[in-house]
Amino acid sequence: VDVTDINTVSKTNLSGKAYKGSMPGWPGNMTGKEVLASMIDMAAGTEKGYDAQYGYDYAQLVSKFTMGGVFYHQACDNYLDEKMNADNKPNDKPYKDGAYYTGKEHSWDEAFGYWGAAAHGATLSPKQNYDITKKKNMRDADANGDGLVNLKSEMNYAHAYYAAGFDKGGNTNYYNTITKAFIDGRQIITDAKGEKLSDAQRRGVKRHARTICSNWEKVIAEAVFKYAGSVYSNIEAVKATMGGNMWKVKGSAEKTEHQAALRKYAKYWGCLLYTSPSPRDWMV
């Protein structure tokens, strides 16, 4: 890869981008920002992010919460929602002084960044996109052929990676559907050539936004279904190592097997707990 310092990719403070409403699924009636800080604080007091006492796998809790409470929330409840309105982030003005892109271009591109697809991902198969994320196919990741993988533009992340994983089974086409809608919506904004979007153009942009977010939500639903199945399977695995009572697990081999089952259960429960999207009203 061409990056050794993550700050060269982005210095964004994600806590400030978290869902600002109450998160009832976490104790204390906290906001999204407070939940994220709380998880990180508690993870710091554990061994490798795993809390054996309460069965929390913070590596999963933090990553999955961030994907829903920051990435999906920001894209579909902010950049592709109110920021596509006529009176918000106008297209006939630079995003800020000195910027060579408009407010609408910036907002649309921000949402694409949260989606997490490689810039050339739409030219690849689902398996290629999946293997790129798994670092099993770095040749196809290297779009410009410079012998390096650019982590900002040539790698898949987060829900885009999930989509590729589901699509490679051949029954869905989430990755390309969402990515193409991003490309087509961006083209409408580009074709306006720095002028205000017409009502027809804005309707077209919002139509693509609905395609993006409705399919993105399906990706999340698929993940919930997957993790729910994993939780059930791991409950059965835990039962099998308990012999009816966890305190009766005897012998180092049995104890190790039991602890491994508990860790898997905690991992997938953590995945399931905060895989769901944050509340939003963009579809209303």
Identify the meaning behind each predicted range.
Residues 1-276, 280:
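Mature extracytoplasmic or organellar-lumen-exposed domains after removal of signal/transit peptides
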